[in-house]
Amino acid sequence: LVGSEMCIRDRTAAAQAQRDTLTFNNDYYFSKRNVEELVPVTGQNIVMLGNSLTERGFWAEYFQGKRVLNRGIGGDCISGMINRVQPIVDGRPKAIFIMGGANDLLFSKISNEKLLQQYERLLDIIARGTPRTRVYIQSLLPLNEAHNEAFMKGKNARFAEFNALLRAMAERRGLTFIDIWSAMQRNGELPEEYTFDGIHLKAAGYAVWI
């Protein structure tokens, strides 16, 4: 998830010609990866892996003394996380909290089933490389579709369907599923007081998350 409401409007037209799957390879992605790797992950760390919803959170401040590293990159998708997870795995952190898939479902035509396969690949890399790391699967968050009905209409239904797949996958793998969706949603939508643009969170939204 990237930027402001203006950015979302700019991308609405592009949604008419969406790709089958999403990749995220631009200067911002690569510069963020480069800067993040200046601070290597260690066995004492808890890692927050995700997109802009994760990136915008002040996790180290929220959980002082827990050695939390923010590895969110705005705009990132599951394939992008696959491409950058190895340095995290190599550090064998205590725990990894994953929030991903929203950009894939918003900005590509990928099916829920194919996206789940990508998610499984991400988890396989983590499980093989650092089997003792605790992995937490966080649900997708609801949207406030009224902010951009032309672009977001019907997306909450897809998000809810994908969350059900994530929950089942977590149970099958013996991982913890964190249902943030249910804590935040009101009548299936992200409440206005939690969001600036229908996607990204205000402080009140992060207060619910943590």
Regions found by a protein language model. Name each.
Residues 1-8:
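Short, small-residue-biased leader/transition segments that mark boundaries at the very start
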Residues 46-48, 69-72, 95-100, 134-139, ...:
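Structural recognition of the beta-strand scaffold that forms the well-ordered cores
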Residues 142-210:
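Catalytic His-Asp segment of secreted/periplasmic serine-dependent ester chemistry enzymes
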